[in-house]
Amino acid sequence: MSQKSQFAYRSSKSIGLVNASENYASPPKFEAISEPARNACYSPNGKLFAYATATQVVINDTESGAKLTQLPAANTYELGFSPLGKYLSTWERPGKEADGTPKQNMKVWNTETGQLVFSFVQRNQTGWNLQYTCDESLAARLVTNEVHFYETGNMSKGPIAKLRVEGISDFALSPGQNHAVAVFIPEKKGAPASVRTYSIPNFNSPLSQKTFFKADKVQFKWNALGTSLLVLTQTEVDKSNKNYYGETNLYLLGITGQFDCRVDLDREGPIHDVCWNADSKEFGIVYGYMPAKTAIFDNRANVVSIIPPAPRNTLIFSPNSRYILLAGFGNLQGSIDIFDAANNMKKITTVEAANCTYCEFSPDSQFLLTAVTSPRLRVDNSIKIWHITGAPMFYEEFNELYQAFWRPRPLNPTLLQNALTSASLPSPPTPHASASKLAAKPSVKPAGAYRPPGARGQNSTFSYRREEIDVMSSGSANKHVNSSRQRVVPGATPVIDGNKKNNKKTKPAVKQVAQPTAEVSDEKKIRSLCKKLRAIDDLKSRLNNNEKLEATQVKKIESEGKVLAELKALGWTPDA
């Protein structure tokens, strides 16, 4: 594996940069940190890496790992680089200054000098960052009914252009060389929703537009060249009651305005995923009720390839456009299929990545990184790297892993051409020693029937209820059988009717059920109190980080002594 391949991770206790070579070591000048970090990201060109702690934001060079800049941006929760890495945006929670004015919580920094370039109030965390043109000459942000455009070299001067569209709720700048913007206006008072594209800064008339109903929100998906736009629409509620998550539709628009259409799909059901190929000539869709169907379309919405139905909901094209990944994540099993587009969509391998929450091709398209992260899943957190042939390359476990991702790298056109013309697959390199653990990891056993925590490790506490249901279902036809069985309430003293035969059967049953009931009650109390104690510890940690707490949260911290006293009364010890 090339030394240029690198990935980063953020866990509960550390930040790491790892050169993905045979020894999987950090860059020579990278200083490992042992304090928690709130976010981390690479610049899109892969040259810079930034992470935010409670007190500052640090920017590192990715090749050497050396620390370049420290920004005085405390309490930063979000980070985002401009396309060429010249600017870094930071976002912190909204608040007020000492004089009561809103705090300018969104800030833009120059990564070379560390100077603050621009700041403003940004209340919403969703869509918080500026959007840039590919050359970084312009930056844009959404305000009420307008998109404001700034010259990046002189943001403090204010917007140089404004696109006013009544009711606009979302926008997306084109990544192409010709500067363009797409905007979405949702349905209102019976009028249809619409998507329009404009050339910047000529806003007199749109380049293209499409109107449609059944659209409460959209996802914009430009191809890499910025010549075509996919618009995935979604309603909050499916009025036909066929889909719990609302109704989805897909539209394709050409930037010149000479072509637009709704992408017709031959199966009912939701659109699970849609994405462009890196060559900008094709896009793929996973759609329909499970098992879902996958189809590849050209840039005129004509089907060029179909992959057989399977329980999959995620589609990813490799950066070199040769490989197609289909996976079933979320509530599906976690199987990943990899297909070779250069060999008539032949399946290369299937990788089992149970509970995977993140999946990404390496920039050279030879490797796959899968990760299980918190808070989505708090068990089995790990990073796994696989070769494109399915061979395991690297494996590392974490107590709590929050992020893991490859360093971006511009694709070499020569490598792209070679990948598409070569009929053979690359051979896997020598794996890291940790890969043996991944290869030897046992398959997941069936979980079996669910049992409540208090009933685990002992006879079922629900056996009485099951027996009662069985008896009741037999009805009056078996009255002579029912008359010989006495109903017993768990934990209660049985009624003695003087019949020795019945007493012999009843007493053991009462003994089995009554004893665990008291134990379960105490266990539940201890678990509930321990949960309160953990919440108090978390609040104390936030208080130590100078976070402002609500009055109810402060009161909760003050109740720590009472909680500990109740736990000790139940026989709990800190080591238990």
From Swiss-Prot:
Q: Does the keyword Cytoplasm apply?
A: yes
Q: Which Gene3D superfamilies match?
A: YVTN repeat-like/Quinoprotein amine dehydrogenase
- Cross-referenced InterPro entries: TIF2A, TIF_beta_prop-like, WD40/YVTN_repeat-like_dom_sf
Q: Which Pfam families match?
A: eIF2A
What are the subcellular locations of this protein?
A: Cytoplasm
Biased region (Polar residues) positions are 475-486
Outline the WD repeats, range by range. 71-119, 266-307, 308-349, 351-396
Region labeled Disordered — which residues? 422-461, 475-505
- GO annotations of cellular component type: cytosol; cytosolic small ribosomal subunit
Q: Which UniProt keywords apply?
A: Cytoplasm, Initiation factor, Protein biosynthesis, Repeat, Translation regulation, WD repeat
Gene Ontology biological process terms in this record: cytoplasmic translational initiation; regulation of translation
Q: What is its main location?
A: cytoplasm
Q: What GO MF terms are annotated?
A: mRNA binding; ribosome binding; translation initiation factor activity; tRNA binding
Family per similarity comment: Belongs to the WD repeat EIF2A family.
Q: What does this protein do?
A: Functions in the early steps of protein synthesis of a small number of specific mRNAs. Acts by directing the binding of methionyl-tRNAi to 40S ribosomal subunits. In contrast to the eIF-2 complex, it binds methionyl-tRNAi to 40S subunits in a codon-dependent manner, whereas the eIF-2 complex binds methionyl-tRNAi to 40S subunits in a GTP-dependent manner.
The molecule here is called Eukaryotic translation initiation factor 2A
